[in-house]
Amino acid sequence: MQEFALSLLVLLAGLPTLDANDPEDKDSPFYYDWHSLRVGGLICAGILCALGIIVLMSGKCKCKFSQKPSHRPGDGPPLITPGSAHNC
């Protein structure tokens, strides 16, 4: 029984290849021009990359180099003071 089921499965899996379209048929609705698709994707990626760099360099994110040296973590006031915790 298992041999019959396996052979039926192989037969059913192989049937669509008998009626498959020619991959070089340019009039087929499932024919894709992969080179043009790849070039279009690279152009789109380049434009998005350039836009990202422009946004980063647009001046909205300014770094000030003449700032005072940053404080060490222990120099600030304590965040938890005695009596600030509450019992639930």
Swiss-Prot record:
Transmembrane segments: 39-59
Molecular-function GO terms, alphabetical: ATPase binding; sodium channel regulator activity
Membrane topology note: Single-pass type I membrane protein
Superkingdom as given in the UniProt entry: Eukaryota
SUBUNIT field: Regulatory subunit of the sodium/potassium-transporting ATPase which is composed of a catalytic alpha subunit, a non-catalytic beta subunit and an additional regulatory subunit. Interacts with catalytic alpha subunit ATP1A1. Also interacts with non-catalytic beta subunit ATP1B1. Interacts with the alpha1-beta1, alpha2-beta1 and alpha3-beta1 NKA isozymes.
Family according to the record: Belongs to the FXYD family.
Xref: InterPro entries: FXYD_motif, Ion-transport_regulator_FXYD
Chief localisation class: membrane
GO cellular component: endoplasmic reticulum membrane; plasma membrane
GO terms for biological process, alphabetical: monoatomic ion transport; positive regulation of sodium ion export across plasma membrane; potassium ion transport; sodium ion transport
UniProt keywords, alphabetically: Cell membrane, Glutathionylation, Ion transport, Membrane, Potassium, Potassium transport, Signal, Sodium, Sodium transport, Sodium/potassium transport, Transmembrane, Transmembrane helix, Transport
Taxonomic lineage of the native organism: Eukaryota, Metazoa, Chordata, Craniata, Vertebrata
Keyword Glycoprotein: no
Subcellular location: Cell membrane
Cytoplasmic side: 60-88
Signal peptide range in chain numbering: 1-20
Gene for this chain: Fxyd3
Name by which UniProt lists this protein: FXYD domain-containing ion transport regulator 3
Extracellular-side segments: 21-38
Function: Associates with and regulates the activity of the sodium/potassium-transporting ATPase (NKA) which transports Na(+) out of the cell and K(+) into the cell. Reduces glutathionylation of the NKA beta-1 subunit ATP1B1, thus reversing glutathionylation-mediated inhibition of ATP1B1. Induces a hyperpolarization-activated chloride current when expressed in Xenopus oocytes.
Description of post-translational modifications: Glutathionylated.
